[in-house]
Each structure stands twice: as C-alpha cells, then as structure tokens.
Amino acid sequence: MGGLEEIKNEAVDLENIPIEEVFEQLKCTREGLSSEEGNRRIEMFGPNKLEEKKESKILKFLGFMWNPLSWVMEMAAIMAIALANGGGKPPDWEDFVGIIVLLVINSTISFIEENNAGNAAAALMANLAPKTKVLRDGRWGEQEAAILVPGDIISIKLGDIVPADARLLEGDPLKIDQSALTGESLPVTKNPGDEVFSGSTCKQGEIEAVVIATGVHTFFGKAAHLVDSTNQVGHFQTVLTAIGNFCICSIAVGIVIEIIVMFPIQHRAYRSGIENLLVLLIGGIPIAMPTVLSVTMAIGSHKLSQQGAITKRMTAIEEMAGMDVLCSDKTGTLTLNKLSVDKNLVEVFTKGVDKDHVLLLAARASRTENQDAIDAAMVGMLADPKEARAGIREVHFLPFNPVDKRTALTYIDADGNWHRASKGAPEQILTLCNCKEDVKRKVHAVIDKYAERGLRSLAVARQEVPEKSKESAGGPWQFVGLLPLFDPPRHDSAETIRKALHLGVNVKMITGDQLAIGKETGRRLGMGTNMYPSSALLGQNKDASLEALPVDELIEKADGFAGVFPEHKYEIVKRLQEKKHIVGMTGDGVNDAPALKKADIGIAVADATDAARSASDIVLTEPGLSVIISAVLTSRCIFQRMKNYTIYAVSITIRIVLGFLLIALIWKYDFSPFMVLIIAILNDGTIMTISKDRVKPSPLPDSWKLKEIFATGIVLGSYLALMTVIFFWAMHKTDFFTDKFGVRSIRNSEHEMMSALYLQVSIVSQALIFVTRSRSWSFIERPGLLLVTAFMLAQLVATFLAVYANWGFARIKGIGWGWAGVIWLYSIVFYFPLDIFKFFIRFVLSGRAWDNLLENKIAFTTKKDYGREEREAQWATAQRTLHGLQPPEVASNTLFNDKSSYRELSEIAEQAKRRAEIARLRELNTLKGHVESVVKLKGLDIDTIQQNYTV
C-alpha cells in the first residue's frame, strides 16, 4: 500500500501520466476492484463525499433565541431585573424567570421539531444520493457514488454528473459541461486519456473511466469552499420579517404613548410605570411565531415526502401553494413512457425489405442492456431479444445524443462484411441518407399520417462499410423505413388535469414531439388543443406570420407547446413569470436544468437525471401528474395553517397593546406582568398544535396577502381590546354584573379584579384562533382534535387560576365560580361577532360585489364542492370562446343550474364522442369489415381500445 499512501498525499501526478501508468500506480486493472479491496481503500481515502460541517447542537439551540422577536423578550427580561428595581421593592425576579422559561420552551420545541424534520429529510435524501455504475468483483452494478475509491472503473453516460475525478479509457470523445466548476458556458470535448472532474455533467457520449481522486481530494472538493453558498433570503423570510416588524412597531408606539402620558402628565410611580411597559412588551410580542411557522413547514414537508414529493427547500412549499401555471413534460409525466410499435403501420421504403427486417435493423441499432425507452421498445418487438445480436459481431455502438438525435451500430455479419444500422429522428435520418425530394415528400406524408393519430415516427437506415473500420464514413446510407411509436396517456392524467383546473392551476403540456401528436394527446387528456410549435414563437426562425401577434399573450393562453427545445423551456418560464404567474416546471433531463432553476418551483420527476435533481426544488419519487396535484393540495393546507397563525399573531399584538394601554391610562390600573406571562405561555402551548390542525385547502392559488393579514389583525384585535375595556369598565365602575347575575361586587378589590381581567383576556385571546383558522363560520368548520384538547386544557388551567389562586407577588386573588361563569358567558356572547368582522374585512378587501364574494365559495356557501359544477361550466364557456367556437344554443344557465341535467349532458356528450370514434374506426381502410372480428378475436373491449390506442 506504499504507493497508495503517495497518492493520498497527492505526490503522484495522476492527471498527466500515461493511462497505463495510472493503473500501475493505483494497483488496479481494467476489471475493476474487488469489494474487499474497495472497503480497504475507503478506510484509507475516506468516503467519496464532501465533509459536511457538523453544526454544534448547542449553538443551533441558542440560534432559536437569536431573532428580532426574541431580542424584544430578552430586553424585557433585562428590564425586569435592572430597571424594575425602584419603589422600595426588590428586582422583579418572577418575571425574569418567567420570560427565560418562555424563551427556552419556544427554542426547545423549534429545536426538536426541526431536528426530527431534518432527520426525516436526511433519510429521504439518502435515497436520492448520486448513484453511479461501477465495476466491482467483475460485475457492473449501480452503487452509491459515496463508495467510490481511486482505482474503481466507472461508466459515464449522457445526463450523469461525474461522481469523482477520473481519467477516460478507450471510446468515443465525450462532451462535458464544466460550467458548475469553471464557469465555461459551452461543453468541452474530452478524449480518451483526458481527465474529467467530479461535479461536471456529461452532455453527450458514453465511456468508461478509472477513478483517480475522490471526496475532498477532487478538484471540486478543493474548490468546494469557493462554491456559491449564498443563502438567498426567501420570500418567506421577508414576510416573517414584515410581520415581526409590524408587531414590534405597534408595541413601540404603545410604549411611547404610555411613557408620555404616565410620567410627565399623570406623574405615576416609577415602578408601576415600568411594570405597565413590561405588560406591553411581554404580551405583545408573538414570540412563538418563528417556532410555529418553522414547525408547520417541517411537519408539512414530512407529509409531502410521504406522498412522494421530497422538498429540498422548505420555502418551496409556499410557492407550491401559490402556483397557478404548471408546465408539464408530456413523456413520462402525462404519458406512461412505455412505447409500443404498431407493426401493421410500419412503412417500408427500400425494395426487397420486409417489415420484419425493418424491425430487426431498428433493434440492431438499439442497446440490448442499459436501454432507454425507445431501445426497449425496439428490442421488445422481436420474438426473442437475443435476435438483436444473433449472427453478428458488434464493433461499435454510437449512443443517442441531443445533437445527432440518432443511434447507430457498426457490426460484422456471418460472411465477414461490415455494416451499419441507424435509427433516429426522421429529419436527421433523411439528411443522413441525402434523399431525393419525392422520397422526402413521401416520408413527410407518412409522418403526418402517423401524427394525426398521435403516433411518433422513428426512421431506420442502413449502409455498407467497405473500408472495414469503425472510423470510416462508409458507403451511401439507405432510407429503409418508418416505424410508428405510441406512448399511451397515464390512466389518471385526464382526471388529474381536471382536478388541477378546479384548483386554479393551468396545466400546459411541453413536448419535443410534433404539433399533431401534442394536439392528439391534449385531446385525449381533455386539456385543450390550443397548442403552438415553440420554434414558431421563440426560436431564431420565428414564424413571420406570428410576428404581429403578442407572443407573451399566446404563451399565456396556450394549452401546450410542441417541438420544444431545452432553451425554449427556459424562455417559456421566463415569459410566464413576466406575466406575474407563479410557474412550476417539471423536467427529467440534463438539458432541463436551466428551466428548472429558473421556475418558481422546479420539479424533478421520478427517474430524473442527477443534474435535473440538483437544479430542482422538489424531487418526486413516484411517476405521474397526480403526485404533483396532491403536493399542491398539501402545500395549500400547510400555507393555510401559516396564514391563519399570522393573522392570529397580529390580532393578539393589537389586542394586548391597545387593551392594556387604555386600561392603564384611563383608570390608572396596573396589570401584573407575571399574569401576562402566564397568558403567553398557555397561548404558546395551544398555538403549537396549529401545525397539525385540520384545514381546508384554499380553492384557488394562495399567497401572502400582507394587506389582508394586517387589516384583519387590526380590526379583530381592536374589537377584542374594546371588549376587554368595556368589561373592565362594567366591573370596576358599575354594578351591572352584580345586578344582573347576582355575583358579589369586586369593584374595590384590586387583586380580584386582576383575576377577573386575566380570565377574560385569556379566554378570548385563545378562542380567536378558531376564528382565524376557518374560512367560513368558525363553529361550523371542525378544528383538529389536538387544537381543541390544547384549548380546553389551557382554559381549565386559566379558570382554576382565576377561581382559586392567591398569589401575592402576582397581585391576584380567587374570584370564585360565580364570577368565572359570568366571564365565560360574557366571552361567548362577544365571540360571535368576530366571524362577521372577518367576512366584512374580506368583502371590503376583495373589492367585488357581495354575490360574487359568495360565489367565491367563502363564508356562506352551501354549494357542493364549493360550486365546482358552475366553475366547470364557466370554464368550458371560456374555452369555447377562446377557441372561437359558438357557445351552446341552449341557455347555459338553465342547463347548469340543474345538477342532474348537467350530468346527463356530460353523458350524452360522452356517448356521442364514443359513437363518432367507432364510426371513424369503421371508416379506416385498415379496419373496413374487420373491426368487430379483430376485437372479438383478441377478446378486447372496443371502448377500452379507443381510449388507449389508435388502432
């Protein structure tokens, strides 16, 4: 192992010595390492990953006490012992200890929850750890990149992120994108023997390589500290700061008013003045806000991961809740990505060749292992997959790349003659074969015929290679035939797209296929056929006829785009964002990375390449669109909880500051800071459960409407403050409660008034959460069991304190059950108007007519599914108008008012569509006369056939 020590200390220049010497120095062969040798070397070189900075748990815990809201509380704690020290009384130790306890409780909850969420996320991310193909014990297998050691043989192909620094072995040159490391925007060509760096992306080609450096010894590992590690302040952070600042400013205004009135005007005692200021500071600060919101997000992201969507960035959840446009890849997301070939429709262009031979050539130009979807479909068409290589010797395989858009195999037949077979995009193959105009016309006619049925075309060509070498150009290429490929839609795609529209998310299909195929898939999925070829709108060769049209508007209104190149995806996202949309983009390939990064929510679909995963915000672990839609719903629930809480926090700040300010200044009554602390601690306990509360997701895309949050908070908070002031006046200055309810008068007992006031503030402060958490009447929308239990427990504690506690230091004395009952009754009566205030604010802010507000399925709606059917009808009419179709003759209102007739109408339409489809099938030449017999022979159901296949 002496030589390996030198390598570990980087004494050997493995980058530049000849490749044979690399094997000597690394003591390995082209057959790779054994597992034992691999384990031995891992102990020596360490795992192939960058060392993560271990965060100190104590510092992390203390970090939760380091934010503007906590600073205000810490200032209050210092005030309690440093300033509250006059008037012949000792420092206020009770309040000091209480504040510290409150801070510790908050930090502990944040710390535990974030830790749990972090562990869950780490476990999930481990499943997504970069994988690599490595040769161990003489066998190729997919392993985690972390196990690589110098001397391993790895395979690198299109879309892979290179897992370690390596030297390339024999094969075709690779195109490598090193922009992540060097900033070069263009891919560089790497020839056999060259070094490739860890972290760069393979853009073209496929080759084997020998690992020369791993982990911290790689070029990437050494430069890792230079890599961009800026933490961009998310939108969420900005909102948090804005709400925190609003609360702090409200308290500051209250304190300034108190100081001006109490000392120069009323000449109050120093100590009681300081205590009044402490009441505002302790009661007004929503100290639990960062905790509640981060816990809600952490629990939410865990829930999302259980549904198959892993969030890499917590704040992507709030963007997901506000997403109103989803650009979805067609292949694999809307469709199954399981291609099949319709053998009857294969077109042959060369004399003396039959359909079976065309299929055989296509299978030869495919991989037999490590296949992509098209390779698998071609080889799968043969009776036995081994036929693809039967009787021939493979010389060289050219893998698919986005530039040539074809694959090719050079092989030697049984007689020793050399041939090449190639399959790929028809345009590329036509150019390759240098076909005459009439052949091109015929090919295009067949492609169009396929496309009308939603079939993609694949062209096959062959050539002789008389020079008998893999580098030679060979003889002229012959265009052999065209194959129709069909990728059936997923069974749930159509239903999911309908769901998305109900949720206010517009799904746009993005496909590299021709326009006709895009439209056919759109028609099958019921998402509309208003599609454009993206090159006509965006590329260099824009369509002159579309020049005059507003491109941005066309992009906004389109149902999808066909013939899309990766750079168009980026452009589409950018244009939609300029139109103020929040855009989600799905992607899987290495070339989708820029668009995924640009989109508000980049979604890497299941089986995406490493490059796409690293650029995305959310990684899906299951295929299909339905995962995305359920993630949208979950995100909206999470967002709803956070929004409910922020409205609550603002209301409570206003209610405490205004209520206690008025009582202190009008009646010169000093409330005990310790009792405000008790209210704050009990409130926090209850509020923590909101992260698991049962909520209805918003029926439309949701966003932080700060105006609504502040307006609602100010109105509800002021109303509650007024209720408290009126209650205090009735108890302190009148005999109202004594006369009406027969309770004894406590107007002269300051300590009993303290208990009564404490209970009144405590009940309504916490009951307010039920108002802010609901979109309609708070007593109709059922809250989560946890929230109700926490509320009941906290109020039991508060009531028992008010009834029995006799604490001299807190200046409270028990008031008995009679008064407790009266206070509960008072609180319940004045609770009901809160909902009406809530609706009123929403009405004023929405700026819409009252009926429209009702229609917007908020507050009073009794409609099933929030009036979904009317929305469907409105949407259908809008779509017809958009596509220039006449609205139905019948007065649509009467149609859609009656639910049963709406259903009936749908059924009639379905049947009509089915009849038309059967008629069309019968008309097709291929089926004249045999439709029924073919169907019966194969034991198929004609209805299912036309939903899934174009026969």
Curated annotation (Swiss-Prot):
It catalyses: ATP + H2O + H(+)(in) = ADP + phosphate + 2 H(+)(out). Mg(2+) binds at residues 588, 592. Its main location: membrane. The keyword tRNA-binding does not apply. It is found in: Cell membrane. It is a multi-pass membrane protein. Pfam families: Cation_ATPase_N, E1-E2_ATPase, Hydrolase. Keywords: ATP-binding, Cell membrane, Hydrogen ion transport, Ion transport, Magnesium, Membrane, Metal-binding, Nucleotide-binding, Phosphoprotein, Translocase, Transmembrane, Transmembrane helix, Transport. GO terms for cellular component: plasma membrane. It is an enzyme of class 7 (translocase). The active site is at 329 (4-aspartylphosphate intermediate). CDD domains: P-type_ATPase_H (cd02076). InterPro entries: ATPase_P-typ_cation-transptr_N, ATPase_P-typ_cyto_dom_N, ATPase_P-typ_P_site, ATPase_P-typ_TM_dom_sf, ATPase_P-typ_transduc_dom_A_sf, HAD-like_sf, HAD_sf, P-type_ATPase_IIIA. It comes from the Eukaryota. Its EC number is 7.1.2.1. Belongs to the cation transport ATPase (P-type) (TC 3.A.3) family. Type IIIA subfamily. This is Plasma membrane ATPase. It comes from Oryza sativa subsp. japonica. The lineage of its organism: Eukaryota, Viridiplantae, Streptophyta, Embryophyta, Tracheophyta.
